[in-house]
Amino acid sequence: MRLTNVTSMSAQRILGNNTEDVDRESVRLASGDRIYHAAYDPAGLAISNKLRSRLRSMQQANRNANDSVSMIQVGEGVLSSVHEMGARLKELALQSSNDTMGDSERQMADLEFQNLKIEIKRILGAAKFNGQNLFDELGGKHDFQVGINNDQKADRITYDMKKVLKSADTVGLGNGSIATKGQSHKVLYPIDDMISEVSRARAVLGSMQKRVETVSQGIMIGYENEMASESKIRDIEYVLLTANLLISKLKQDSTIAWLAQANMESKNIEKLL
């Protein structure tokens, strides 16, 4: 006669559940991930994955912003050099305007003057960042993608060379010369205009850099907030999980003892029969 040990069957079922709980909590504790498998929390996993995608996008947007700042700083550095050369042009023009200068001295001063003009045009035309022209006519517009979406106003900042600086030819003073006193007088105002234009361009770049840096700070604040939200959904609470694991192990141990007792009782009954 075969006996059905209902108590043993119940104990085995409960032991299986307890073992599953222990395994699940152990995996979570080892991985640090509350949703180690999608079955643990399907909705939470979907939200967490979406947040993680946004977080990675925000990281890239912040890198874009940092690269944009670097590009602006390169341009500002070039304009700083041009500004210094403009100041030297003004010195030479004033020196050549003075009657203490003879024709030969003016010719020597004009040689430096012309070379500075050539260098200004060259440095503006050669200014590049990662192969992108900054100030010459080929530069055009550059979009700084500092957002994670496709909104032209909200997610991009446009660098427009034509709005930042006039052409290199204009800044370079064209055919200006200080070979004579009269010519020296004529270039004084154009040099002042050139210096003012470069100063204005530097101010434009400075304000643009400040804007991009502000956007970058906003990105990181949003990143921190969304990271905290994602962490609450996905990450485990070690204290709570450790307590749950301990409880599950205690249940598992007690169920094993119960199962052993149920099996022993079943064997004793079989012996009596």
Where are these regions (language model features)?
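A short, polar/charged loop-to-alpha-helix boundary motif
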Residues: 242-247
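Amphipathic alpha-helical coiled-coil/heptad-repeat segments
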Residues: 1-10, 20, 34-37, 49, ...
